[in-house]
Amino acid sequence: MFCVQCEQTIRTPAGNGCSYAQGMCGKTAETSDLQDLLIAALQGLSAWAVKAREYGIINHDVDSFAPRAFFSTLTNVNFDSPRIVGYAREAIALREALKAQCLAVDANARVDNPMADLQLVSDDLGELQRQAAEFTPNKDKAAIGENILGLRLLCLYGLKGAAAYMEHAHVLGQYDNDIYAQYHKIMAWLGTWPADMNALLECSMEIGQMNFKVMSILDAGETGKYGHPTPTQVNVKATAGKCILISGHDLKDLYNLLEQTEGTGVNVYTHGEMLPAHGYPELRKFKHLVGNYGSGWQNQQVEFARFPGPIVMTSNCIIDPTVGAYDDRIWTRSIVGWPGVRHLDGDDFSAVITQAQQMAGFPYSEIPHLITVGFGRQTLLGAADTLIDLVSREKLRHIFLLGGCDGARGERHYFTDFATSVPDDCLILTLACGKYRFNKLEFGDIEGLPRLVDAGQCNDAYSAIILAVTLAEKLGCGVNDLPLSLVLSWFEQKAIVILLTLLSLGVKNIVTGPTAPGFLTPDLLAVLNEKFGLRSITTVEEDMKQLLSA
C-alpha cells in the first residue's frame, strides 16, 4: 500500500504516505492496492478513448463510466474491494469494445501505452492485490526522485477531483465533448509514467483550466434543474417526527428522495456538503426538507449514531459506520461503498423510507437555530455594485474567501480563530464544508449586507471566481488587485483541483492549510510559492496582518 492523497496521511521523517495494513482514512491495504489497479485499467481505457476519437468514434458509455469509476478512488468514497474490482473489470470490457470499434475502422489500430492491454490475472482478491503492486504510484521513486513523483501525484489527484465534478455534472445531464476528450488525453498520458518536470507542471495547469469548464457545466446543471440559489434560512436543530438524513453532494438524489418522501410523514435533513441545497427553489419547495443536521464530516461517527433515522450517503465522505453501530441504517448510493453496508443501485428510496417509518424519529422539536445559505452566483453578481459602493465609501475594507474542506486535525481550529478575528469592516465569503468551523456563529452585517456569505458547495468556487472577475472588470483592475484574500483549507482531491483551477486562472497569494499536501516536496512548494505566491498558514495574527496590508 502507498497512498498520500489526503491531508491526514501519515507523515514521518522517513517519508509521507500511508503504507501499512490500513490507511488513516480506514481504507485497507487491499482496497488501496486494488484502487491502483483500477486506475491503471482506467488509464488504458482512456488511451483507447483517445485513439477512438481519432477515428471519429465517441462512446458515451465510456465517457460516462470513466470519471465515475475514477471518482470511486477519491478519499472516503468506496472502501469495498469487490466493487473496486468490478469497476476494473467493467473498464477492461469497455476498453475491449472500444478497441473493436477502432479495429473495425482500421485493422492496424494500436495504442502505445503501457496500460492499453492490461488484463486482470485472477478472480482472487489476493492475486489481484499482488498484481496491483506493479502499479503502485511510487514504484519508480528511486529512479525519478521525489519531485517528479510529487508532480505526477499532483496531476493524478487533481484529475481525480475534476473527475468527481464531471460525474456530478453528468448526473444532471451535462456533457461537453471537449472536456471528455481532454480528460481522456490527460488520463492516458499519466498512464505512461511521465517524468518531465515542465510537462507535468503544464499538465497541472491544464487540469485546472479544464476543471473551470467542468464547474461551469455543473453550475448550469444545478441551476437549470433546481433554480438559482437565493438567501434562505435553514434550521440546524431537530424537528419532531420520523426522519432521513442525506449527505454528500448529489442534488438529484436529494430531489428524488424529497419526491418519494412527500406525504409519508418522514422529514428530510441535509448533512455536510448537502447544506447549500436549501438555497435552491426547486428543493426548498418541499416543506418536509426541515433542516440541516450535524457539523463537519469528521464528526459523523458520533452524530450519525445519535440520529434517529436512516442515513443516505450520495458521495464523499463516508467513514467507518461500525464505530457508532449505525451500519444497519446507513445506505450508500452511486460510487459510495462500505463493506456490509446496503447499497442502492437505482433511484428507488422506498427501502430507506420504510426503515425511517419503523424508527422512532425525533421525539420533540428543539428551539430553532437559523443560519443563512443560498448566496449563489446570481445573488453574488447582483451584489457586485453594492460591494463596490461599500468599498468606495470605505465601509468595506476587505473580503476574505475562507473555505475548503474540513477535517479532524486540531490545527484546523485556525480557521475558526481566523473567522472570529476578521475585522468588523470586512466580509467573509465561504464555501465547502470548512464553513462548519464557524457558520453557526453570529457575524452581523455591513449596512444590511451579511458579513458571512455562504456561496455553497466546494464546486461553487465557480461562483466566487465569477464574482471576483466581475468586480475586477467593474473596477478596471486585475483579480489580484482586488481587496480580496483567499484562505483555503484542504483535505482531499476536490480541494486539490480547485486550487489548480485558481492557479491556472492566475490567482496569486493564496494561503492554504492546515498542512501542505504530503506529496508536495519542499522544492515543489518553493516553485509554487515563487510562481504563484502560494504559501501555508502561519498564525492568525501574522496572516491577518499580512493579508490586510497586501
From Swiss-Prot:
Annotated GO biological processes are:
nitric oxide catabolic process; response to hydrogen peroxide
**What pH dependence is recorded for this entry?**
Optimum pH is 9.0.
Q: List every position bearing Cysteine persulfide.
A: C405
UniProt xrefs under Gene3D superfamilies: 1.20.1270.20, 3.40.50.2030
Expression is induced as follows: By Fnr, NarL and NarP under anaerobic conditions in the presence of either nitrate or nitrite.
| UniProt note on regulation of activity | Inhibited by oxygen. Activated by cyanide except in the prolonged presence of excess cyanide, where the enzyme is inactivated.
Look at the named UniProt entry and state the broad enzyme category this protein falls under. Answer: oxidoreductase
Note on how the cofactor is bound: Binds 1 [2Fe-2S] cluster. Binds 1 hybrid [4Fe-2O-2S] cluster.
Required cofactor(s)? [2Fe-2S] cluster; hybrid [4Fe-2O-2S] cluster
**Which reaction is catalysed here?**
A + NH4(+) + H2O = hydroxylamine + AH2 + H(+)
- Give UniProt keywords alphabetically: 2Fe-2S, Cytoplasm, Iron, Iron-sulfur, Metal-binding, Oxidoreductase
Quote the record's binding site residues for hybrid [4Fe-2O-2S] cluster.
H249, E273, C317, C405, C433, C458, E492, K494
Subcellular location(s): the record lists: Cytoplasm
Q: Which GO terms describe its cellular component?
A: cytoplasm
Q: According to its UniProt record, which protein family does this protein belong to?
A: Belongs to the HCP family.
Name this protein carries in UniProt: Hydroxylamine reductase
Organism annotation? Escherichia coli (strain K12)
Encoded by which gene? hcp
